């Protein structure tokens, strides 16, 4: 049995966790081992009690956060904690708050009151003081199907339990090693000791994927290209209306949808359309289409809305300005107050699943993309790297992708050997 299977065998069912949330109990939710690999105590903000808060503080870091929908965060006038969010996971912290009635705000009783108030649909901004001792978080619309984080998991669980979409989360600290965080084996023992259910975000994603659809297939047509004839399948996101397209060769649902050659390609107007030499996006798109046509079976999912690794076209051009002044592609984004990579792959996973794909040979130089897709119910059988043409216009960008973002780019090392002066 693999480590992944062993960990999964120690988990309870999503249905059991939802039932406990509805009953006012806490559960523990663990995320992907390649993400934070941490377990959070989670319960519904609407049903917060001093006892639940005291338990959370006793066994966690004590940094209690309250995930809310973006709509509720706006209604309560909860702006971002900082204009320049540099959190590695893109966690959307807002200003901290306390209920405006109570004592110091730090006690379990006061924090439970603040949490219930955050979940109250009748509450408004005047019911809170700022700063405080509870940290609201803004959850992504679409929940764990869009972002596989504890923030979204808490909101999804509360909603699935028939409660207000507001949760309470805090990371479980290891009792066996108080300097670190608890991992799955210890979390299982912790949950057994305290009669708590333990589930994973991966399970919750799978549960939601089976029960909900966030993309709709709209149209299907033949698409002749310079690389051969494909089928173009158009989709629309139910969340924000973004129009997406899958370029399909052959019968990808045959053989159980196993080991399908797939490229999940992030939109890049400058590289894909204008042939920009600052990036390798156009090269990767064209090579992927060629490989798939050659194989006779595969998919390119073209992810609109991923421009500039998710920051948008104009922001990407502003980042280019900063790169012209010496910043690399990561620092340029951060200097603009934007994440180095804001992309999420839940929508692409749903498109692949709708097409009948169950496991895939991923065409990518980015190992992190594997984690993003696997966390959304798609299994990665293998990964096919794409050779890139390295030249003076893109070498700095490619070096940053290799050195700071973990991309697999052996062609860069070859270029460095041939150009030691650079």
Swiss-Prot record:
Q: Name the segments for region: GTP cyclohydrolase II.
A: 211-422
Where along the chain is Mg(2+) 2 bound?
36, 150
Site (Essential for DHBP synthase activity): give the residues: 133, 171
Q: Which Pfam families match?
A: DHBP_synthase, GTP_cyclohydro2
CC annotations in GO = cytosol
Recorded catalytic activity of this chain's protein:
D-ribulose 5-phosphate = (2S)-2-hydroxy-3-oxobutyl phosphate + formate + H(+); GTP + 4 H2O = 2,5-diamino-6-hydroxy-4-(5-phosphoribosylamino)-pyrimidine + formate + 2 phosphate + 3 H(+)
- Co-factor(s): Mg(2+); Mn(2+); Zn(2+)
Keywords associated with the record? GTP-binding, Hydrolase, Lyase, Magnesium, Manganese, Metal-binding, Multifunctional enzyme, Nucleotide-binding, Riboflavin biosynthesis, Zinc
Provide one Gene Ontology biological process annotation.
riboflavin biosynthetic process
Q: Which domain of life is it from?
A: Bacteria
Q: Is the Transmembrane keyword given for this protein?
A: no
Which residues does the annotation say bind Zn(2+)? Answer: 268, 279, 281
Pathway involvement of the protein, from the record: Cofactor biosynthesis; riboflavin biosynthesis; 2-hydroxy-3-oxobutyl phosphate from D-ribulose 5-phosphate: step 1/1; Cofactor biosynthesis; riboflavin biosynthesis; 5-amino-6-(D-ribitylamino)uracil from GTP: step 1/4
- Identify the residues that bind D-ribulose 5-phosphate: 35-36, 40, 147-151, 171
Cofactor binding note:
Binds 2 divalent metal cations per subunit. Magnesium or manganese.
Q: What PANTHER family does the annotation carry?
A: 3,4-DIHYDROXY-2-BUTANONE 4-PHOSPHATE SYNTHASE, GTP CYCLOHYDROLASE II-RELATED
Q: Which family does it belong to?
A: In the N-terminal section; belongs to the DHBP synthase family.
Please give the function described in this protein's UniProt entry: Catalyzes the conversion of D-ribulose 5-phosphate to formate and 3,4-dihydroxy-2-butanone 4-phosphate.
What's the protein here called? Riboflavin biosynthesis protein RibBA
Q: List the source organism.
A: Corynebacterium glutamicum (strain ATCC 13032 / DSM 20300 / JCM 1318 / BCRC 11384 / CCUG 27702 / LMG 3730 / NBRC 12168 / NCIMB 10025 / NRRL B-2784 / 534)
* Gene designation: ribBA
């Amino acid at each position: 049995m693999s480590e992944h299977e062993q960990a999964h065998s120690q988990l309870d069912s999503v249905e059991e966790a939802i039932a406990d949330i509805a009953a006012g109990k806490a559960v523990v939710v663990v995320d992907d081992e390649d993400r934070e690999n941490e377990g959070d105590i989670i319960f519904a903000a609407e049903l917060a009690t001093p006892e639940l808060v005291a338990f959370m503080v006793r066994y966690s870091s004590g940094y209690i956060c309250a995930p809310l929908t973006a709509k509720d965060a706006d209604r309560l006038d909860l702006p971002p904690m900082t204009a320049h969010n540099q959190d590695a996971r893109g966690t959307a912290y807002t200003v901290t708050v306390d209920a405006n009635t109570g004592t110091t705000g730090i006690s379990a009783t006061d924090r439970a009151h603040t949490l219930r108030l955050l979940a109250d649909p009748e509450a408004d901004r005047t019911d809170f003081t700022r700063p405080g001792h509870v940290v609201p978080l803004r959850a992504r619309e679409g929940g764990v199907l869009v972002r596989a984080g504890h923030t979204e998991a808490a909101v999804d669980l509360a909603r699935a339990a028939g409660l207000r979409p507001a949760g309470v989360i805090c990371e479980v600290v290891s009792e066996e090693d108080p300097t670190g965080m608890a991992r799955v084996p210890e979390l299982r023992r912790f949950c057994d000791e305290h009669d708590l259910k333990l589930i994973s975000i991966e399970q919750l994603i799978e549960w939601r994927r089976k029960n909900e659809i966030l993309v709709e297939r709209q149209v299907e047509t033949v698409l002749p290209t310079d690389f051969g004839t494909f089928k173009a399948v158009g989709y629309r996101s139910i969340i924000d209306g973004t129009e997406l397209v899958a370029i399909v060769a052959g019968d990808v649902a045959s053989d159980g949808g196993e080991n399908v050659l797939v490229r999940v390609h992030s939109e890049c107007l400058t590289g894909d359309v204008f042939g920009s030499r600052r990036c390798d996006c156009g090269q990767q798109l064209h090579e992927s289409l060629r490989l798939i046509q050659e194989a006779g079976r595969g998919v390119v999912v073209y992810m609109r809305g991923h421009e500039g690794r998710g920051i948008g076209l104009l922001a990407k051009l502003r980042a280019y300005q900063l790169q012209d002044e010496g910043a690399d592609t990561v620092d340029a984004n951060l200097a603009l107050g934007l994440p180095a990579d804001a992309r999420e792959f839940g929508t692409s996973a749903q498109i692949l699943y709708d097409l009948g794909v169950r496991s895939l040979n991923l065409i990518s130089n980015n190992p992190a993309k594997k984690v993003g897709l696997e966390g959304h119910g798609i299994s990665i059988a293998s990964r096919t790297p794409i050779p890139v043409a390295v030249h003076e216009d893109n070498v700095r960008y490619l070096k940053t992708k290799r050195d700071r973002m973990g991309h697999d780019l052996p062609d860069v090392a070859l270029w460095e050997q041939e150009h030691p002066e650079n």
